[in-house]
């Protein structure tokens, strides 16, 4: 049993290096207070987090519209697809056949090794829109896709990234949106988990939240 989420701290990388994280002591026993507590200020799309449909669809689902059963999964598939700086994930990368009953698709690229370097947020890989379209059309059982780089959107190809997010998250009458988990910790996992529990930070009306992920 392991966590597939990174710890959040003041050095957590952010997409485009554009969001500040500030975690500080609100009260501190070392300073004479009766208890310890923290003050936390950050964007909701920080660290290992999930993008929900509302993030790119004005009428999309928000957090509280997903019941508890939508966060526990027994059919999880891990695929290894090494990606370089600014490389775009395409349908052609999926040489390993995906199982038709997969609920969570985890893509391990190895880009996590750059997480404490500028290139992690500035030159990250991205995902082409065709992947979202293809997965939704051919693998209707997939509820979530996750990966070990900072965003579905390559920072150097932002317009394509916006289209890609919509390909996964926008509602249509043919198939359900696929939720997106970005910035996963995958360095300690090499095989398909038997079970995955995704625990979202419960914020009303959220279009995305940090998640704690436990793999069994």
Task: Name every feature range the model reports, one short phrase each.
Residues 1-216:
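Active-/binding-site microenvironments in catalytic and ligand-binding cores
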């Amino acid at each position: 049993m392991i966590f597939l989420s990174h710890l959040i701290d003041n050095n957590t990388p952010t997409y485009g290096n554009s969001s500040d994280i500030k975690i500080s002591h609100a009260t501190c026993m070392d300073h004479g207070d009766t208890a310890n507590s923290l003050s936390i200020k950050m964007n909701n799309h920080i660290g290992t987090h999930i993008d929900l449909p509302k993030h790119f669809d004005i009428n999309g689902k928000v957090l509280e519209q997903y019941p508890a059963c939508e966060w526990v999964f027994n059919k999880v598939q891990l695929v290894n697809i090494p990606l370089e700086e600014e490389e775009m994930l395409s349908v052609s990368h999926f040489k390993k056949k995906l199982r038709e009953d997969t609920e969570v698709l985890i893509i391990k690229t190895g880009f996590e090794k750059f997480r404490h370097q500028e290139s992690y947020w500035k030159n990250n890989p991205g995902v082409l829109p065709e992947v979202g379209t293809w997965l939704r059309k051919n693998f209707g059982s997939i509820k979530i896709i996750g990966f070990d780089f900072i965003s579905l959107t390559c920072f150097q190809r932002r317009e394509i990234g916006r289209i890609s997010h919509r390909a996964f998250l926008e509602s249509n009458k043919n198939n359900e949106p696929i939720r997106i988990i970005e910035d996963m910790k995958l360095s300690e996992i090499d095989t398909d988990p038997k079970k995955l529990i995704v625990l979202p930070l419960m914020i009303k009306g959220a279009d995305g939240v940090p998640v704690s992920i436990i793999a069994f």
